[in-house]
Amino acid sequence: TKPYYRTRVLIKSGYYDSLSDEDFFKKVFPKYMGYPLDLENPKTFSEKLQWLKVNFRDPIQTVMVDKHEAKHFIAQRVGNQYIIPTISVWNSVDDIDLDRLPNQFVLKCTHDSGGIVICKDKSTLDWEAAKAKLRTFLKRDYSRIAREWPYKNVPRRIIGEEYLSELGSNDILDYKMYCFHGEPKLTVVCSNRFSKTGTRMNYYELWRLDTSDAA
């Protein structure tokens, strides 16, 4: 059993709910990272992320993690052409009318991370199973289980989006740019995100492929 598995179970069960954010991270960080957390003088990237979780609060963070509101923020600055078209937004799973959705679509919760329902063909979609997944996603609270403050005040809604795919492929590449001091330093390209053999390839400056971390 991996050392952090028990910690994950305890977190989800609410075992650490009474701890302050600082005490929470000092308790669980070593389980995941293998070394103690120093919030007084953070040196590693992971330590600095925990410091930000404890000390940094900005309302714009809430906008950025809201999958619906973030679209408006981005569109106002760079244009709608960079935004995946929204079909609709619902407050409840029961508000979704499957008959009014296109044959292909994507559903996810505006406050969630990772939870998603992808429909490539409505005739083969198990709608009851999809609704059950969405109800589970709606219950997730990253402000509690991960102590990520930005998620605390995000309205729990479901957003429907158009289904996208790469030309000539059923997959779509996911590009993530990591910036340090305002400069892009690391680009991660993800493919096969929702397959059992998901692939992640890490690229660094000048798009040099780092094959050691590919999985």
Task: Give the positions of each predicted feature.
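Alpha-helix initiation/capping motif
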Residues: 1-6, 15-21, 44, 66, ...
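Conserved, surface-exposed functional patches that form binding/active-site neighborhoods
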Residues: 178-206
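Active-site nucleotide/adenylate-binding loops and adjacent lid/helix of ATP-dependent enzymes
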Residues: 50-57, 61-173, 178-183, 187
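Membrane-proximal basic amphipathic "stem/tether" segments
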Residues: 1-56
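Hydrophobic transmembrane signal anchors and adjacent membrane-proximal interface regions, especially
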Residues: 7-11, 76, 209
